[in-house]
Amino acid sequence: MAPTIRKSHPLLKIINGSFIDLPSPANISAWWNFGSLLGVCLIAQIATGLFLAMHHTADTSLAFSSIAHICRDVNNGWLLRNLHANGASFFFICIYFHIGRGLYYGSYLYKETWNIGVILLFLVMATAFVGYVLPWGQMSFWGATVITNLLSAAPYIGPDLVQWIWGGFSVDNATLTRFFTFHFILPFIIAAASMINLLFLHQTGSSNPTGLNSNLDKVSFHPYFSYKDLLGFVIMLGALASLSTFAPNLLGDPDNFTPANPLVTPPHIKPEWYFLFAYAILRSIPNKLGGVLALLLSIMILFLMPIIHTSKLRSLMFRPIAKTFFWALIANTAILTWIGGQPVEDPFITIGQIASGLYFLIFVLLIPSLGLLENKLLKI
């Protein structure tokens, strides 16, 4: 009998092995949907971004008015712009759920997949940051100024590094042009890195909620999980469409409706909501270099997860003590997000410092020590 084309064709058999006949654990829950949802987010962002780039002008004198032009004069431009801006928020919601799932169920023990994932997080954060500068509103300009200025904390090369990034002595036309370039190219780098992420994942297969070996109980990805993922797509795209049409500016900053003005500083400079937890950690340290290092470490600490895993059990499903502290970490991150949006005054400064300390304490001290404690309890 002639082999099926999807199994014999050089290109189709790669797709078949990744999305059709892929053996998947039968017991994976909806928490495993977020990987494919991230793929949908990326495709949606590239599609809407491509059309927006056709009408956007990366020039300080025209950028702000080109956004107004897109919203007023371009066919469905308002929808494209709102889908793209809110799509970024949904992208980060999916990323944070995806990372949370990985931490809870021990997915980080697939080291290569996890490390590529953390690199992807950095790339997505960089893309979102440079993209936020493009409308050239007040918060775009001052956000770019504040965040790029952090590089000046680097010893010896700091000031030169900042001027090199700026392309001059301040955030100006050269900065906007290069940020547009970065914002255009980075999503394609993210797409390539996502494929590497999938490649590594398919070497080992997916983990599952129990953290046990699931080779005895696997089903094909299609039709079971393709339809399960499809439900996730409908829910997410429905929520994105609803937010983009009914409350498109809910997550934005009102300051960004004012054109960038280097002579007027906004009363509270803050990034988009998805960066607030890291921004709170940055602000909680009075020293500039210390703050920058803490900011970097708040994400880079994820690289340590495979090293600090001391438990004999993979998943938190059977680890009641560690489970409690996982949710404490989630609550703590939520508190940091809230603090990041507050002005720098008491009691917010103190709360931010305590929450930042706890954030690192849970990762560096509690996760490894609780693993060892639970190992001892298993022997009793």
Swiss-Prot record:
Where is heme b b562 annotated to bind? 84, 183
Q: Which residues bind heme b b566?
A: 98
What GO molecular function terms would the record report? metal ion binding; ubiquinol-cytochrome-c reductase activity
Q: Which InterPro entries match?
A: Cyt_b/b6_C, Cyt_b/b6_C_sf, Cyt_b/b6_N, Cytb/b6-like_sf, Cytochrome_b, Cytochrome_b_C_euk/bac, Cytochrome_b_N_euk/bac, Di-haem_cyt_TM
Its placement in the membrane is given as:
Multi-pass membrane protein
Mind telling me which SUPFAM superfamilies this protein's record contains? a domain/subunit of cytochrome bc1 complex (Ubiquinol-cytochrome c reductase), Transmembrane di-heme cytochromes
The protein in question is named: Cytochrome b
Lineage runs: Eukaryota, Metazoa, Chordata, Craniata, Vertebrata
